[in-house]
Amino acid sequence: MSLVKRSVAEFIGTFWLVLGGCGAAVLAAAFPNLGIGFAGVSLAFGLTLLTMAFAIGHISGCHINPAVSIGLWAAKRFPATELLPYIAAQVLGGIAGAGVLYLIAGGKAGFSLSGGFASNGYGLHSPGGYTLLACLVCEVVMTFMFLMIILGSTDRRAPKGFAPIAIGLSLTLIHLISIPVTNTSVNPARSTGPALFVGDWAIAELWLFWLAPIVGAALAGLFYHAFLDEPGEETEGTPASAQLRTEA
């Protein structure tokens, strides 16, 4: 599969992640009387990843997250030469998803970006008022565990066909844990899209939601490769290295 086609798949996947996950947060979380709340938003993010893993996993690997691509590279499962195209596609997809969400949300009288538009933040902009340090630790650890689950469930020794389920459920669990802390990022592209529309504080605090997920993902990739991989496991550049294996 050509790099262009795989990058297009990453764009579409990240678009859906932001529209579906952040859309649930913005449009449905606090809907009068019937709002889905934190649990519903958590499930929405997990479902967007689960559905896209089956839809594009065989095309691009369904990274739809710069931290995932970097973590796979650190684990020697993804070539460095393809990092920039993948990350660019993911960021653009996240921005496009946030743009469509903005158009939809703006169709309701009284809509305002002052509610945060599902942006990530710390301190005063943390949903629960958590400190910068707490938010940093949370994002690093959550992304580390996310990558450990991705790497383990896509390992050639793992049961075939179950990786998308494990990964989707892990993202749901991560959101259940960390929405009150940072509004949950673990994905720089997911954070960038909404932040560009909110501007101001969301842009000023965006650095954390690039730094922490990348650090957590890279540490997980290095750890898994050093301590849990077996000789003969996938190496950089092998065709299967980027894929979430979904075959039975």
From Swiss-Prot:
Q: Where is this site: Involved in tetramerization or stability of the tetramer?
A: C22
Please indicate the residue ranges that the annotation assigns to the motif NPA 2.
Answer: 187-189
According to UniProt, residues marked as the site described as Selectivity filter are: F45, H175, T184, R190
Signal peptide per UniProt: none
Place the motif NPA 1 on the sequence: 65-67
Q: What topology does the record note for this protein and the membrane?
A: Multi-pass membrane protein
Where is the protein situated, by its record's location annotation?
A: Cell inner membrane
Q: Name one GO molecular function term.
A: water channel activity
Main location class:
membrane
Q: Where are the transmembrane segments?
A: 11-31, 36-56, 87-107, 132-152, 161-181, 203-223
- Protein name, as recorded: Aquaporin Z
